[in-house]
Amino acid sequence: MKIFIGWDSREKIAYQVCRASLLKHTTVSLDITPIKQKDMRDRNLYWRGHDPMSSTEFTFTRFLTPYLADYKGWAVFMDCDFFWRGDISTVMDYRDHSNAVMVVKHDYVPKEATKMDGAIQTQYPRKNWSSFMLINCDHDQVKQNLTLNTVNNESGLHLHRLQWATDDCIGNLPVAYNYLEGWHTKDDCPNPLAVHFTRGGPWFVDYMDVEYGDEWIKTSRGLVNE
């Protein structure tokens, strides 16, 4: 199973814990690849100029996922601030080949004006849909509309609103695969498979007491002790 994780040099521990939690719970073999912006630039796959509104180094490189998967089969992209409590392979049960991409369709409106590191918290329709994507890399809309030129030249809103796919080709996934800490509650999903620390995770002092933060900290300590 192909997994791509956004990598940010400022949040290495977040990536490490995300990866460890994936491996802890999976029942299938995972091919996990961090998408590092420097590597993408070195390979001439990414040449966008710096966007001061980008809150992470993978704000746009995430959309290289189909290219990196050779436009074959299904691939998952997720932000590095995900923490897995269950088996990611179960998401494959929701595959619908008529769809170009499948996401959790939250109606998310951030309460905070800034993100965990002080970056401006921009608001736009379909916010956070692109933070976890099950992508049908064989789909015509993906192959035609998520090219290198698209990723490097289209606007951020075009990419993050998934406007490279028609609405009828954007499938829905359960909240369990992208539970937004601070937004969702146990009424929405009593036992999430993946917690997304989108406001800020326990690797930041001010966010150590967030929901499911104790589980993240326990996993991170296990990595340190290995």
What are these regions (language model features)?
Residues 30-69:
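Active-site-proximal specificity loops/subdomain of glycosyltransferases
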